[in-house]
Amino acid sequence: MLYLLPVGAQQADGFCLMEISDSIYMRIYGKSFKEDCTTSRTDLRYLQVMHYNKEGEVCRGELICHRTIANDLLAIFKELYEARYPIERMVLVDEYNADDEASMAANNTSAFNFRYISGTRRLSNHSRGLAIDINPLYNPYVRWRNGKRMVSPEGAEKYADRSLDFPYKITRNDLCYKLFKKYGFTWGGDWKNSKDYQHFEKKWVE
């Protein structure tokens, strides 16, 4: 689905950054922006970016994130686009009714979503728009419970084996990893007690 940009949006070569307009707010309210959302609408920004998929096709993507990381994300995705780095899909998680599992299973890259960390009652950094998940199906969230490995999303179990070669895989030698680290993000693949290979986040610093 194609969405028209509001008048006055800052654009350059298919990339734009803007405040949350009324039309965008209508798309997210009650979904990623839930009624009890503690993140202010004014703290969020809407981004449109260009990206390639693994077939080399040019795609238009969109994200919502916290204002403090918006310029960083815009710069990162411009560099990824120039390098033809493959990202399969990038639409608002609201297209999946803010269902994180469904979005991940579709290998959809997304950022803001007011939700809890999978398997817990703690708010995720996605709730403030300070985290982003890149190509999540191929870079799953892996944790252990009572000695049993748990992999999210469902269907991503084979991609939890990081010794294998497959498309969209993020490693420390990967351009995506290097760019996010360059801009001060931390990677979930470096966590000790669990691994979230899709996940990059940044602390809120004004």
Region annotations inferred by a language model:
Residues 25, 29, 33, 67-82, ...:
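Active-site-adjacent structural elements in enzyme catalytic domains
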Residues 3, 76-80, 84, 180, ...:
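Hydrophobic, Leu/Ile/Phe/Ala-enriched alpha-helical segments that form helix-helix packing faces
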Residues 2, 39-44, 105-107, 125-127, ...:
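A generic structural signal for short, non-catalytic loop/turn and secondary-structure boundary residues
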Residues 1-8:
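Hydrophobic h-region of N-terminal signal peptides that target proteins for export
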Residues 10-57:
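N-terminal module-boundary/linker segments of secreted carbohydrate-active enzymes
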Residues 87-88, 102-136:
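Mid-length scaffold segments of soluble, non-membrane domains
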Residues 39-104:
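Active-site acidic/histidine clusters and adjacent loop/turn architecture
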Residues 117, 123, 129-206:
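Catalytic cores and adjacent binding grooves of peptidoglycan-active enzymes
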